[in-house]
Amino acid sequence: MRCTIFYSAAFIASLTSAAPTGRRQSSLSQDGNYFPLANGFPKPNRDGEITIQDGAHGTLPNGPPPPALSAEGTTNLKLIALNELFEVAFFTELIYNITNKVSGYDLGMGHDYMLDSLNAIVNQEELHVLNANGALEHFNQETIQPCKYNCKLSSLDFSQLVTDTLIVPVEDFQSAIALAATFTDVVLGTLQDVNQIFAKNQDDGLVRAVTSVVGNEAEQEGFFRLMQKKRPSSQPFLTTATRDFAFTAIQDFIVPDSCPNIATIPLKRFKPLAVETKTIPAKNQNIKFSFAMKDAGMYDTNDMRLTYLNGQNQPIVEKFENVKMEGEKVFFEALFPYDDFLMNGLTIAAVTMGGDEFDDADKMAEAAVFGPGLIEVD
């Protein structure tokens, strides 16, 4: 066991210290269009499906589908397909960069192991899409089609990730893994909501399969955390989320107006909330946020609150402090009460209206106007 631990530490060090090769930065997709893949995904023939299953080290579920699907269950499956399609695009781009040793993605002795791991992950995500869309098709519902995605992982045009140390431009392997860990955390929280909604709407026949996906995503998350030299598990009860928060977060990676049928998903999209603070250590502190002045409309900042979601706790509501209007943005601060609640792992932040207390994540999302701001602390 001790030898294994030391070997793992040395392996991780080789990944984090690998120097850029100096090769030009490039991207698999210049216009954000990643599909179809070589195996025919997202609509593979039988041979393509077998290839995907071989790469995923397992098969699609072959049991009988449930007898019926509710309207809320349909929304669940569409959201799952939307998210998993993005993940396939993301990991396909990441595999391309590692395979071609794009600047920032030369992993030295860890190259082959990482490619083997990521190839398994991307094939597993493809099966998640096929399973969700297959269920929709079985119940004569419209399947979710791919969008175009902002997955140029070697480009500073990509989004930024707030971690417990700094804002990381996604321009290298470590930044990409940190981003993957954060959106996987959001998925793990959202699938809790999905399963509860299935159960409430007599779609319990889908809970077992989706829970197996929760386990798969959690295995991935532990791997991503290990690659960042973090503990494999962040907290005893993972942060919950809601479908609306996930639906909004996914669209940060989507080229606007590129989704053929995202409008068939009846979920709410919030206005953007930026986490401006670059360093967020594990302690009580004020965090700076911002949102666009044009999105504020007739809202009064005196009526706004910054609300946090962490673990399985009730939402934490904090008042705005130091509100400033600068340029086209509204800046404000709010207390991040880490010490009071041990806010490790993912915290979801949102600007809410109409209350200083919310019973649960659903009530918080109903009152949210801006969000989600995603914060990772370890």
What is the role of each PLM region?
Residues G22-D378:
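All-alpha RGS (Regulator of G-protein Signaling) helical domain and cognate RGS-like helical scaffolds
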Residues M1-S26:
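Fungal secretory targeting signals
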